[in-house]
Amino acid sequence: MSKYSGEEFSNNGDFYDDFAHTGDPALDMEYERNYYASRMPENVKYFLMNFCQAVKEGNLYDIQNMYENTFPQISDHHFDKSSWPEETEVGALVENDKVFMILYKELYYRHIHARIPGGPKLDQRINSFFNYCDFFNLIISAPNPVMLELPDIWLWELVDEFVYQFQNFAQYRARLTDKSQEEIQQLCVNHSNVWSILCILNVLHSLVDISNIKKQLEAISGGIDPNTVSGDFGKLSFYKMLGYFSLVGLLRVHSLLGDYYQAIKVLEPIEIHKKSAYSHIPACQISTSYYVGFAYMMMRRYADAIRTFSDILLYIQRTKQLYSTRSYQNDQINKQAEQMYHLLAICLVLHPQCIDESIQQVLREKNYHDAMFKMQCGDLEVFKSFFVFACPRFVSPCPPAADAPMEDYVKDPMEHQLQVFMDEVRQQKDLPTTRSYLKLYTTLPLAKLASFIDPNANDDDVSKLLIRLLCFKHKMRNLVWSKGPSGLEGTFKSGSELDFYIDDDMIHIADTKVSHRYGDFFVRKIMKFNDLNRKLKNINI
């Protein structure tokens, strides 16, 4: 690959000479290739030609290197705030190779969504959708498997971007305040099926079905060779990984729609809390845990949410070097990690339990404990701000009607989910106070506890206290996953650090808190110290 020369597109007034066309297709194509190539920086031209050649030959190493390294570098150098060359310009260079042009346009529109100030125009959003349709029709509708080799990281980011652009378009079409009547008419009538939820679900389910990924995952769980159930398509890594990533895409889509039960349900073949051979893409693993943990939290399965968040945050701490070389991926993962720390803090307030010491250390260093203390004291605004920062950007499955008032409907799904969450928080906001009193005693009369909570308590307040204690019992019993491929399964367990029962007017309290295992903490610190010591000895001064 040639070095970057810093050249930009020519602005010297070149014009397209129609009279240079001879009518001979071969000569005309050669003219167009030379014309567009002359307007393009040399390193961009050679990159595109080499990229096309690598895709044609199925050279996975070169494709991955150009996708992960060269393409972002050229984007930074030449197209930081502008789009890559148009389809006609690139097509002339690569002889309009059908497969490569679809892949190029996927990167082209992805770059526009990520880099162009103001975002893509309506026609670019529509063209991107139809380009995805071309790609998925190419690989799903074919009678035989398409012999296409792409690196797993590209397949993951392709599916992830597909869902992201659906989400982005849903928010775009819900914002009517910045659109003319003509644009609304075009969105609601002419292009009503573009980026529709049915299209998205149809594509993702089709990829899952054609790859037989569910059957393959079930076979692996049962110790059976997955190739016996994979079929002609599923035995190819290309289809297999697209199927797996589509399961994660479905998890994300259902989470964005607020259907948390279905979000966990679609992952049933995947044992969420176990490592698998398919979880080698860090961004995929982190995204999966984020949406699974959030779904658990909204289903009031706090113990499962805490375990999910804790496990993945530990994984991020240990594997940062795997993705730190790619700045945009690093930024995305860091943001998602920050969101998960916020969600973990919420879960620990609503459902206190022991977590790994290194996660506790991060919570202390980032001053989460101050906010957690405010939440424990019933500060609803802190709950609200944490939720709004950390939750997904929800969307509505249906666009506003063509005759809907000219308003901004983007926040409606978010406000609905926030209301659902805050209703649950309001039911629990007094429980930390109740817990703090119960932890001080082994036996405590009901009347005395009522007087602690309200010094002017009367008999009616004692009756209300029974309701509060029943609420405490109910909220502290969660469905907790223990084993099996379904993340929806589990057994009811009490997650509180204490338990109690009431005999007549006396509360009998038992402390069930599990003592800290300090041995593991010191072993980790000793190993870290030894590793640091070895590195210091290897430094030559």
Curated annotation (Swiss-Prot):
**A GO molecular-function annotation:** translation initiation factor activity
Name the domain of life. Answer: Eukaryota
Quote the cellular component terms of the Gene Ontology held in the record: eukaryotic 43S preinitiation complex; eukaryotic 48S preinitiation complex; eukaryotic translation initiation factor 3 complex
The answer to whether UniProt assigns keyword Phosphoprotein to this entry is no
Q: Which InterPro entries match?
A: eIF3l, PCI_dom, TPR-like_helical_dom_sf
Keywords, A to Z, come to: Cytoplasm, Initiation factor, Protein biosynthesis
- Which is a GO BP term held by this UniProt record? formation of cytoplasmic translation initiation complex
**Domain annotation PCI: ranges:** 308-516
User: What Pfam families does this protein's entry cite?
Assistant: Paf67
Q: Which PROSITE patterns match?
A: PCI
Where found?
Cytoplasm
Q: Is Cytoplasm given among the entry's keywords? A: yes
Which family does the record claim for this protein? Belongs to the eIF-3 subunit L family.
Q: How does it assemble?
A: Component of the eukaryotic translation initiation factor 3 (eIF-3) complex. The eIF-3 complex interacts with pix.
Query: What does the function comment of this entry state?
Result: Component of the eukaryotic translation initiation factor 3 (eIF-3) complex, which is involved in protein synthesis of a specialized repertoire of mRNAs and, together with other initiation factors, stimulates binding of mRNA and methionyl-tRNAi to the 40S ribosome. The eIF-3 complex specifically targets and initiates translation of a subset of mRNAs involved in cell proliferation.
Q: Give the protein name, as stated in the record.
A: Eukaryotic translation initiation factor 3 subunit L
